[in-house]
């Protein structure tokens, strides 16, 4: 390997690592959550106490603009749609169409299980009633995140949807980016707020009273669940209000891992790593390969490509950061082990037998099979969802989908005979846990005196419970 490597090397060859050692070897970004918590708590408290007045103050402080309208007027959304570039509109509408098709297939069906005559347990899937969807701003504009949040929520049957997204510094009126507003209009979402950051999360969690006539008495009602990605402050705010409302996940910086063997195209690998690094200086780009030759060629391709991409400075910082690297392995099995330990948000598999590799992948937010399924396809147009678990949480968490916006609720339906068959056993169980009233409430339906423990078995026999 050259001493002038673009990305650092993590060499696992010849090493037999324990599970803990493998997890420790994976490249990760420093999150700084303690510092973020100290900054976010006062924001949450202020929005809870002062509502829209606090939201305007924070917009002025962080976004350098004081919006007249925190809730985007309907005419502004219509104007944004009318002004939208036809080619961009066509792309957005195609993305929506594909995402709707996939989301429709995800809607779970109710089912029931008959355990005996008169003994049924059913399961219903009920939509969350009101959801707050956060769409980030910052270094880029993300109309795609509008689609990825709204479409599965609509497919789930969510009754009330609200979107919060930061005001655009390009708009003197303090409204969000026009492409985001146009996307909301295409999707039929009319409750949109020009509010970003931790203060948007506070608004969703606690609601916000109005402070100016155009706000009304109540600017925003509280929601039941908050979804959508954001920066460290948004993620921290979501974590801090979790329990007051539901959240989808606490997202960290975006990331990609690529499992590649000697047959992969190094130029494409380099382009894919750069594509993810473009998001943020803390974005993670990781190549996992058993081919030192591929690793060398990717390093050389990066040296050629990075200076030529528009956001070269950001990409350079990301690729050279501690959260990125090239992991060298002894073979495909160790590459798979490393990928499962890293648990990437996006995992590309560019190997001779991708299906054999994918069959052994346990941990990934989404898997992109083969060289013609790059991550940006999933970001925009594949029909899959791009709101995915990050920072290793794909070991236990899943990406956004219809299920995110629904709750399974069991319905227990026993008739008299169904309960009678189990009454004595329920009572025995309850007594073993020293919760006799549990058993007594069941026995009360069949015997006269469930509190007379001296005659309980006799009463059960007379009632046909034994």
Task: Give the location of each predicted region.
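N-terminal Rossmann-like NAD(P)+-binding subdomain of aldehyde/semialdehyde dehydrogenases
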Residues: 2-129
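Short acidic-hydrophobic, aromatic-tinged amphipathic segments that line or gate anion-handling sites
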Residues: 6-15, 191-196, 326-331
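General beta-strand structural signal in soluble alpha/beta enzymes
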Residues: 111-115, 133, 163-165, 191-197, ...
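Conserved small-residue-rich beta-alpha loop and adjacent elements
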Residues: 113-182
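Conserved NAD(P)+-binding/catalytic subdomain of aldehyde/semialdehyde dehydrogenases
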Residues: 189-284
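A conserved active-site cap/scaffold subdomain adjacent to cofactor or substrate pockets
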Residues: 249-322, 326
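C-terminal core of ALDH-fold dehydrogenases
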Residues: 341-465
């Amino acid at each position: 390997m050259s001493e002038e490597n673009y990305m650092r090397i993590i060499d696992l060859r010849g090493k037999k690592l324990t599970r803990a050692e493998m997890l420790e070897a994976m490249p990760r970004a420093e999150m700084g959550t303690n510092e973020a918590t100290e900054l976010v708590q006062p924001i949450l408290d202020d929005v809870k106490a002062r509502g829209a007045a606090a939201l305007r103050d924070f917009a002025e402080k962080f976004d350098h603009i004081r919006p007249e309208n925190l809730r985007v007027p309907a005419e502004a959304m219509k104007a944004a749609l009318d002004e939208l570039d036809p080619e961009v509109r066509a792309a957005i509408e195609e993305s929506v169409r594909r995402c709707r098709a996939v989301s429709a297939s995800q809607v779970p069906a109710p089912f029931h299980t008959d355990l005996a005559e008169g003994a049924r347990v059913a399961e219903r899937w009920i939509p969350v009633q009101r959801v707050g969807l956060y769409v980030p701003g910052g270094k880029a504009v993300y109309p795609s995140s509008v689609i990825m949040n709204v479409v599965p929520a609509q497919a789930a049957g969510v009754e009330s949807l609200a979107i919060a997204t930061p005001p655009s510094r390009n708009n003197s009126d303090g409204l969000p980016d026009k492409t985001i507003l146009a996307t909301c209009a295409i999707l039929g979402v009319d409750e949109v707020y020009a509010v970003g950051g931790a203060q948007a999360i506070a608004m969703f969690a606690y609601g916000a009273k109005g402070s100016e006539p155009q706000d009304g008495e109540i600017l925003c009602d509280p929601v039941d669940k908050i979804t959508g990605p954001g920066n460290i402050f948004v993620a921290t705010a979501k974590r801090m209000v979790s329990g007051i409302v539901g959240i989808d996940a606490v997202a960290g910086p975006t990331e990609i891992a690529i499992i590649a063997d000697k047959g992969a195209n190094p130029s494409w690998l380099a382009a894919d790593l750069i594509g993810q690094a473009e998001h943020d200086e803390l974005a993670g780009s990781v190549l996992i390969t058993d081919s030192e030759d591929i690793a060398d060629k990717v390093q050389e391709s990066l040296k050629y490509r990075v200076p030529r991409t528009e956001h070269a400075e950001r990409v350079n910082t990301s690729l050279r950061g501690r959260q990125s690297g090239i992991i060298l392995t002894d073979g495909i099995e160790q590459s798979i082990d490393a990928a499962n330990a890293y648990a990437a948000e996006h995992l590309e598999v560019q190997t001779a037998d991708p299906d054999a590799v994918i069959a052994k992948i346990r941990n990934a937010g989404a898997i992109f099979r083969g060289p013609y399924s790059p991550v940006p396809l999933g970001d925009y147009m594949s029909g899959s969802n791009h709101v995915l678990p990050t920072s290793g949480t794909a070991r236990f968490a899943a990406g956004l989908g219809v299920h995110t916006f629904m709750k399974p609720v069991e319905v227990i339906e026993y008739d008299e005979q169904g309960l009678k068959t189990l009454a004595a056993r329920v009572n025995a169980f309850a007594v073993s846990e020293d919760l006799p009233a549990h058993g007594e409430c069941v026995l009360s339906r069949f015997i006269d005196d469930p509190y007379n423990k001296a005659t309980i078995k006799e009463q059960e026999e007379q009632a046909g419970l034994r």
